Amino acid sequence: MTNLRKTHPLMKIINSSFIDLPAPSNISSWWNFGSLLGVCLIVQILTGLFLAMHYTSDTMTAFSSVTHICRDVNYGWLIRYLHANGASMFFICLFLHVGRGLYYGSYMFLETWNIGVLLLFAVMATAFMGYVLPWGQMSFWGATVITNLLSAIPYIGSDLVEWIWGGFSVDKATLTRFFAFHFILPFIIAALAGVHLLFLHETGSNNPSGLCSDADKIPFHPYYTIKDILGVLLLILVLTSLVLFAPDLLGDPDNYTPANPLNTPPHIKPEWYFLFAYAILRSIPNKLGGVLALVLSILVLAVIPFLHTSKQRSMMFRPFSQCLFWILVADLLTLTWIGGQPVEHPFIIIGQLASILYFLLILVLMPITSLFENNLLKW
């Protein structure tokens, strides 16, 4: 009798995706982040579901409903901080996952990469709307500032902003619709992640060498299931440590003050994972230019496959490209730091230089360096 997992219509899909999937024998721990992102998404959906049972999306009661969750609901504080810090873990895994893709040339799987860029946008939109829900000072002013950026769009900008707000300012209608979108988007993300995997399994995984690994494949289970479980345990260790010992480490103290439209916080800034994009936005004095730079800072990822000039796929054997990659990482860390600083000297000029370097590295220096490396090898 044939094994049930190979004959049952539903089990067959699971089997070919997670059990008998042929995987390269040499993929490193950098390939763990896909499964970790899946775990993060499940944690976020489950904790979010329980939070939604007690949360009220009304401007008068939103802040106090979050307080009620933390004080009166059994383990409400745990669920709330798992959800808040789970978002941070989600983005850490996302950035490392994208970084891995850049370093090892995984972007050459065009469909998989483009769905990934779409996923990144969806996760960022979800996180932004989630940050508005507690209705603290930073929630309100963050929502006001970021939605206001759309007014820079010529002709339709002002109407578009009022349409999103559902009125003439960020108010009850805005909060209600943000809650609705914040609830539905993770399920759209889950569906997109399924498509992401579907396209990935069409080609098979890349590997650190960037070479074809068809001659040396091993089954996903038990080798990579065990490896993924180790990654998940480490993720849970870091997340629970953060939640139980320093739950507010990555948050903003201003968000413990209820939203007040009459009192602007001294420094309006988003969550830490948006600071690099926020720094790029602020480094351009023109409003429309800033908005374009903000969108392009993420959208530039979609262009990377077309700028791949090297004859090799991975950066594993390309030391000059490796140098530029790590300069890009340092540049992004600099932008993250600048995004959290006030708009004054010397932070303005540092932010502007870091923003120029970011686009220069991706669009100009990396492709040219790849051509130079080809010439060195007489290719």
From Swiss-Prot:
UniProt cofactor note: Binds 2 heme b groups non-covalently.
Gene: MT-CYB
Name the record gives this protein: Cytochrome b
SUPFAM superfamilies documented for this protein: a domain/subunit of cytochrome bc1 complex (Ubiquinol-cytochrome c reductase), Transmembrane di-heme cytochromes
Obligatory cofactor(s): heme b
Keyword tags: Electron transport, Heme, Iron, Membrane, Metal-binding, Mitochondrion, Mitochondrion inner membrane, Respiratory chain, Transmembrane, Transmembrane helix, Transport, Ubiquinone
Annotated membrane topology: Multi-pass membrane protein
Leftover remarks: Heme 1 (or BL or b562) is low-potential and absorbs at about 562 nm, and heme 2 (or BH or b566) is high-potential and absorbs at about 566 nm.
One Gene Ontology molecular-function label: metal ion binding
GO biological process: mitochondrial electron transport, ubiquinol to cytochrome c
Subunit details: The cytochrome bc1 complex contains 11 subunits: 3 respiratory subunits (MT-CYB, CYC1 and UQCRFS1), 2 core proteins (UQCRC1 and UQCRC2) and 6 low-molecular weight proteins (UQCRH/QCR6, UQCRB/QCR7, UQCRQ/QCR8, UQCR10/QCR9, UQCR11/QCR10 and a cleavage product of UQCRFS1). This cytochrome bc1 complex then forms a dimer.
Entry's Gene Ontology cellular component terms: mitochondrial inner membrane; respiratory chain complex III
UniProt keyword Transport, yes or no: yes
Binding site for heme b b566: H97, H196
Residues where a ubiquinone binds: H201
Positions of heme b b562 binding: H83, H182
Family in the record: Belongs to the cytochrome b family.
Location relative to the cell: Mitochondrion inner membrane
Ranges that cross the membrane: 33-53, 77-98, 113-133, 178-198, 226-246, 288-308, 320-340, 347-367
Organism: Sorex vagrans (Vagrant shrew)
